[in-house]
Amino acid sequence: MEDFVRQCFNPMIVELAEKAMKEYGEDLKIETNKFAAICTHLEVCFMYSDFHFINEQGESIIVEPEDPNALLKHRFEIIEGRDRTMAWTVVNSICNTTGAEKPKFLPDLYDYKENRFIEIGVTRREVHIYYLEKANKIKSEKTHIHIFSFTGEEMATKADYTLDEESRARIKTRLFTIRQEMASRGLWDSFRQSERGEETIEERFEITGTMRRLADQSLPPNFSCLENFRAYVDGFEPNGYIEGKLSQMSKEVNARIEPFLKTTPRPIRLPDGPPCSQRSKFLLMDALKLSIEDPSHEGEGIPLYDAIKCMRTFFGWKEPYVVKPHEKGINPNYLLSWKQVLAELQDIENEEKIPRTKNMKKTSQLKWALGENMAPEKVDFDDCKDISDLKQYDSDEPELRSLSSWIQNEFNKACELTDSIWIELDEIGEDVAPIEHIASMRRNYFTAEVSHCRATEYIMKGVYINTALLNASCAAMDDFQLIPMISKCRTKEGRRKTNLYGFIIKGRSHLRNDTDVVNFVSMEFSLTDPRLEPHKWEKYCVLEIGDMLLRSAIGQVSRPMFLYVRTNGTSKIKMKWGMEMRRCLLQSLQQIESMIEAESSVKEKDMTKEFFENRSETWPIGESPKGVEEGSIGKVCRTLLAKSVFNSLYASPQLEGFSAESRKLLLIVQALRDNLEPGTFDLGGLYEAIEECLINDPWVLLNASWFNSFLTHALR
């Protein structure tokens, strides 16, 4: 039957049916007839709605699929096939906008022409029997019932069949075809006999007669009657039961379930060692932009043209020198690399026509910085398998690092508002259905809260850099291409702005596999003096390259301008994910949406407007040593976005492991707070699994510190 369903029905219908069965905890491998029934019901609901629209005069019209009038209002709103929360949101929205009475049970459709909810039934039995069952269950004259059978019969409330003859005939023909197809495969009889009546759930209903006798006979051993078994189930305490099952599994297994109390958990141990260092692919809060407003120069939009135009806005260049050397690098090479960039940009400006791309001369300093000819030679295994002492080269264990305050400062800065607008969402046409209206409203409110956020700047910067680097890696594999680090935004007044953060020079990039690495040197402008937090800049060589005049309360002040230079690397798969950083917006929007849904289901109406416009209400943002931090809904949006962005910027195996393992401990603590009396075994092993992920990654260490704050306040 399962194979038949997958062949016979549209994949979208099959997927919706799978979700519905999963939501109700039913196994489609076992309940195959139910699977077929759900697919049939979904298809009938969709066919009922298909091609029916309402024109500007409010009349119901039929439009064939090839007709271009796509913006006509659908006559029917489809409720069936949505998950329960979303379905109730749609129903509540319809009731609020049309004044319709709210139904007790979820209906299948809403008819905008007749202004009524519709319950669709598809039966393998007599239509009038099924109709009565539906009517008894719904107990509402406001919901219209329409029943179809596989034999071509139909029945509807007050013989009002809603649709025209032809539309109903299409549904009946399809049902008849499904029946024929099932019969030809020998599936029909089983399907026909498996239909149960409409189920109504009653509290502790009495079982009598034959059913009672069968219930008593089918109990597990040691139970004489149903009442005894019910009493046992109601008073069942799981402690001890799981140990028994485990001991049967293997002589090696010896698990004692320990009660998890408020005093049980200890804080996660963070590693000791030197402070952790910055490891993002580009500077975050310390970045400095050279910008042009309302760009209209020749070649505007071509990165190299934009970069040269931005460079011309700064007049404070001076002879560069190293102010913070890289401990292990050849620092003069970094200095020479920057001088080479300046010289080659000057050469371009002297040319008659500026080229679209710039490949750097392969000088000794760039060859060193980009690791040219540094990779160990690869030898075929067959040529060396006879060597007696052949072994994998030793690699050192990573050095443990401690949490440093700079990463919390980075996160705080990412949550802040800037004075620029970083995203503009495309127009997606007019809303037709209520659910689209709600979705657009939520999207617009959310965008307003995060469009000025610094985390959004990081998204656009990340998307640009990764796209440019991947393009160059594929288009100029052997060249040391100069790639400007650019972003675009709008000022508060709506003027366009192009920003230059610095440059990347790409090394050789013959990337065959997803994980093959391309080396690059990044050179980024900053006003941050690296000597204030030298541990943060361990991987960088920092040059002083100029003096910048800044406006301040006391007039103009001169500040030294620095260039942060380092060798770095990335891979095709990392660049691919970097290009998709806009997904962070979607993830945080979905988290906000689940908060709105929870609020809406309590109030039984869509709470989007109140949620965003009630400025007096505060929401929990996170834990800190002081306690639960709270803030406005805008602050919540920006914090969730910043977390998502940092998960992308600082993605690592350490983060994957910590997230997966700490989640288990979080669920146990949550169960304790919900008074579910959780029990655990091998809690020490869980702590070990969490703590082995705490090595040197700044973002993971910060998350572990936040987790400890949560433990402290959650278990008070």
Swiss-Prot record:
Cofactor(s) this protein cannot do without: Mn(2+)
Statement: the UniProt record of this protein carries the keyword Transmembrane: no
Cell location: Host cytoplasm; Host nucleus
Alphabetical GO biological process terms: cap snatching; DNA-templated transcription; symbiont-mediated suppression of host gene expression; symbiont-mediated suppression of host mRNA transcription via inhibition of RNA polymerase II activity; viral RNA genome replication; viral translational frameshifting
PTM notes: Phosphorylated on serines and threonines by host kinases, including human casein kinase II.
Alphabetical UniProt keywords: Cap snatching, Endonuclease, Eukaryotic host gene expression shutoff by virus, Eukaryotic host transcription shutoff by virus, Host cytoplasm, Host gene expression shutoff by virus, Host nucleus, Host-virus interaction, Hydrolase, Inhibition of host RNA polymerase II by virus, Manganese, Metal-binding, Nuclease, Phosphoprotein
Main location: host cell
Signal peptide as annotated in the record: none
Gene Ontology MF terms: endonuclease activity; metal ion binding; RNA binding
GO cellular component: host cell cytoplasm; host cell nucleus
Nuclear localization signal 2 (NLS2) (motif): residue ranges: 184-247
EC number in record: 3.1.-.-
Binding site for Mn(2+) 2: E80, D108
Binding-site list for Mn(2+) 1: H41, D108, E119, I120
Co-factor note (free text): Binds 2 manganese ions per subunit.
Gene3D superfamilies xref list: Influenza RNA-dependent RNA polymerase subunit PA, endonuclease domain
Residue window of motif Nuclear localization signal 1 (NLS1): 124-139
Recorded superkingdom: Viruses
Function, as annotated: Plays an essential role in viral RNA transcription and replication by forming the heterotrimeric polymerase complex together with PB1 and PB2 subunits. The complex transcribes viral mRNAs by using a unique mechanism called cap-snatching. It consists in the hijacking and cleavage of host capped pre-mRNAs. These short capped RNAs are then used as primers for viral mRNAs. The PB2 subunit is responsible for the binding of the 5' cap of cellular pre-mRNAs which are subsequently cleaved after 10-13 nucleotides by the PA subunit that carries the endonuclease activity.
Record text on subunit structure and interactions: Influenza RNA polymerase is composed of three subunits: PB1, PB2 and PA. Interacts (via C-terminus) with PB1 (via N-terminus).
Membership in a protein family: Belongs to the influenza viruses PA family.
Name of the protein: Polymerase acidic protein
Record organism: Influenza A virus (strain A/Chile/1/1983 H1N1)
Phylogenetic placement of the source organism: Viruses, Riboviria, Orthornavirae, Negarnaviricota, Polyploviricotina
Name of encoding gene: PA
